[in-house]
Amino acid sequence: MADPRKIVLVSTQGYRRELDTLVAGWIEVGVKYLGVVGVDSSNLENVIDDLCIGVGTDPYFMLTASHGDDETVGDAISLAKQLTEGVGNGPVEVVEL
């Protein structure tokens, strides 16, 4: 991958087990930023951080951010586009879960 990827996760229902598989895949392909917006975004950010840390023997650094109830998907995308240092200039992918 030329640039580390940036993802905005739109949560429609809060935590679902599929998130674990998604995060594992994103780690595998080198995603460096993950913004979360929608239902229970703060909790999902914590879950993602825990998944990146794992048991602590081989932690993966991924910059994460949760967006409050007053923020839109557009706000989350805008922030992701502005971030470049350490995460690259690549496009922002929006994923709904």
Where are these regions (language model features)?
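ATP-dependent carboxylate-amine ligase
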Residues: M1-L97
